[in-house]
Amino acid sequence: MRGVILMAAALIASCSEAQKSAAEQERDDEKAIAEVEAAQTPPPDVVTPQRITDEERARYQLSDSGCAFAVNNPELGAQAILQMNVGYMKFDGAMERFAPDAGAGDGPAGTSTRYDGGRHGLIVSFHQAEAAKAAGDAVSVPTRITLQDGRKRTVYVAEGTSLCG
């Protein structure tokens, strides 16, 4: 008998709990979804581009056409090679290939202002109004590159110079 009374009391107590409004339930659901998504999102892939050597330029058949970007002294080796049909950067000793984005703007020497790679996207801002004549037919263009991971998070930004020709 005592058990029946306890069960009846528990049943009555559970009936007296207020139901959540639709707005409260939606807010709780959105919060739970955001918590799950935050737990599944990996941290950004922090990268530091390395200089591309003359041997790598030869191995990947990168011509002198297009632009070679470097933070300082592009003559010593570029951190990005940007051409009409391809772009390359080097991370952790491995070359990453980029394809020009067909919908992007045009840069100097037939380059693009956006390139897409397997792991990263590259946004290139050429300051062509500040371009200066360099050796031969080359032009020195102040440039900013922004590297993004696959989730469009910025993982690297640098100001430097592009030698274009």
Model-flagged regions — what are they?
Residues 96-98, 121-122, 155:
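Short, isolated positions in well-ordered beta-strands
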